[in-house]
Regions:
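An N-terminal hydrophobic leader/cap segment in hydrolases
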Residues: 2-43
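Flexible "cap/lid" subdomain of the alpha/beta-hydrolase fold that forms the substrate-access gate
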Residues: 25-41, 52, 60-63, 69-71, ...
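Structural cue for short, hydrophobic secondary-structure segments
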Residues: 68, 74-77, 101
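Serine-hydrolase catalytic-loop signature spanning alpha/beta hydrolases and amidase-signature enzymes
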Residues: 79-87, 99
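Conserved alpha/beta-hydrolase
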Residues: 91-114
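Short glycine-rich catalytic loops that host catalytic nucleophiles or stabilize transition states
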Residues: 382-389
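Catalytic histidine-centered segment of alpha/beta-hydrolase-like enzymes
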Residues: 389-398
Length: 398
């Protein structure tokens, strides 16, 4: 089985129902004591209005020669951090790359973003997230990137970077979230008329099931979602532990398979972290799957000392920054802007990586994996499903 690092190297050659505001204040870098030796934490100012926190490896001293080293960017998803790449940064640096993993807009120690539910959601749209990445590259003194790698929601940022600016992003690795392509513009409506609306409302259909359900992405777009997780009864550390366990290969019920259609009867086959019980929040959903104390003590890929880093960051900020990304998707705002690129494809060398136990591959029935390989990406070097990994592939099986 091809390992995660080998694949990358080969490719590159306070109240429920009310928003809790996050105050954006400058914060110190991550202490060296929580980072593997050789990974450094620092800030880059004036990145599209952000003071961006990055983790960095393979760039020991500043000089004009440093920018000649090939740059690799690692983009995390939700609920993750730059820290999520800690296990692969040093191998990439040893292979000769300047490796940068930022806390993206809405996350971690990066500041300058609006954490209010009623605030500036537009700044979290995909085109502005790509602008964030472009601005970071420019601030670092680079004009191109040898490889941009994204996981989960970061997979889509990486995909759009490479589609919009292939002159800058020379290769791309998409992880856990397949890229189905640019949203289409309505076609031939002059002759055929507008497309017919869906015969039914998927959210009403899910709620009408014998076991009433709801889709997690639309739940994440609601006002109560942030405080449900941030102010949960079990505390942020326990919530994150249960959430990460539930979506990992350690949860043995993660046995994903393709779904036939975008219907309630098919969607309800997915685990509750994707198709939730209607009257529960995410905190209650994952609490049922909290691993035992002995299982936590035996966990090698995410020991409690590392989970504490996530708990500190999300305990300070909450989750609204990352949830704004979901709102831009479910509202249609992203799709409306990205239709500008209708028909365009990713043409740079590409690959896809996911865990074999990751439902993220199949969460959108209709074949996002197939669309990615057949239509959206023209230079796909390979799709790798990694044994022993669920959703957190670069952490579970680096």
């Amino acid at each position: 089985m091809v390992g995660f690092f080998q694949t990358l190297h080969r490719l590159t050659r306070h109240l429920a129902g009310a928003p809790t505001e996050v105050k954006m204040t400058e914060i110190a870098a991550l202490p060296a004591s929580v980072l593997p030796p050789g990974i450094r934490s620092r800030f880059v100012s004036d990145v599209n209005g952000l003071r961006m926190h990055i983790l960095e490896a393979g760039f020991e001293a500043r000089s004009e020669k440093n920018t000649a080293r090939p740059l690799v960017l690692l983009l995390h998803g939700f609920p993750e951090l730059a820290y999520s790449w800690r296990k692969v940064m040093l191998p990439l640096a040893a292979a000769g790359y300047h490796v940068i993993a930022p806390d993206q807009r809405g996350y971690g120690r990066t500041t300058g973003w609006d954490g209010d539910y009623d605030g500036d959601v537009a700044s979290f749209r995909m085109l502005n997230l790509v602008r964030d990445v472009m601005s970071l590259i420019s601030a670092l003194g680079y004009r191109s990137v040898d490889g941009v790698f994204g996981h989960d929601a970061g997979s889509h940022v990486a995909a759009w970077c490479s589609l919009i600016r292939p002159d800058v992003f020379r290769s791309v690795a998409m992880m856990s979230a397949p890229f189905a392509g640019s949203p289409p513009l309505p076609f031939n409506t002059d002759s055929e008329g507008p497309a017919k609306p869906p015969a039914s409302n998927i959210h009403e259909d899910l709620a009408a099931l014998k076991r009433p359900r709801k889709h997690y992405q639309w739940y994440y777009s609601t006002r109560p979602a942030n405080d449900n997780m941030w102010k949960c009864a079990q505390g942020v550390h326990a919530f994150m532990r249960a959430y990460y366990h539930h979506k990992s290969a350690d949860w043995k019920q993660n046995q994903p398979f393709p779904l036939k259609s975008w219907t309630a009867g098919e969607l309800e086959k997915m685990p509750t972290y994707y198709i939730m019980d209607l009257n529960e929040g995410m905190a209650e959903t994952v609490a049922k799957e909290m691993p035992s104390a002995s299982a936590i003590a035996a966990n090698k890929w995410l020991p409690d000392s590392e989970m504490a880093v996530y708990a500190e960051e999300y305990g300070r900020n909450g989750y609204q920054g990352g949830l704004q990304w979901y709102r831009c998707n479910t509202s249609g705002a992203n799709s409306a802007e990205l239709q500008l690129f209708s028909g365009r494809t990713i043409d740079v060398p590409s690959c896809f990586i996911a865990g074999k136990s990751d439902w993220g591959i199949y969460q959108r029935p209709g074949g996002d994996m197939i669309k990615m390989q057949k239509d959206a990406v023209t230079n796909m070097l390979g799709c790798h499903l990694v044994d022993g990994a669920g959703h957190w592939v670069q952490q579970e099986q680096p």
